[in-house]
């Protein structure tokens, strides 16, 4: 078990509520405030760090991006991990808009259709949503499992860590109290075979 995984599990044991768990990270509530949470990543190969560096920082202020106070990376003899301090969000109920985002990223609707549908839904700042989605598309290497398999056939496992596959499932959309949709994590690695996932631990905690 790597250091990041142990840290997330120890905080849970000490009574910090777990907001959510994914393959690479766990989001933990703070005891002293409900306005921000800690995102603990178990590996520095997590594509979310690329999202932070290549999208969140350049597009700072975009309302559809999570607000990040700081990200700190740590290295030890076993593996690297990171801790991000970020705003508290809630699961989205605005699935119409998140589905529209998925359709645009996958090429099923064009930009004019996206903007028209946003207008019908009275979405504020649709141009900023479009610019964010275009940035995600620009930074994505694979848009399907078929794309990933074809890419993997021509590169080494080590090189695969630098390739991003789109991963816009429902849990990667959240929202603020005012209902603003937030895209928290659009990518996964194209090769997940050696990822030490926290999902099994979280399932045991909830159902064991």
Task: Describe these PLM feature segments.
Residues 29-30, 88, 175:
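Conserved hydrophobic "DFG−1" position in protein kinase catalytic cores
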Residues 45-53, 94-100, 192-195:
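Active-site-adjacent loop/helix micro-motif of nuclease/hydrolase catalytic cores
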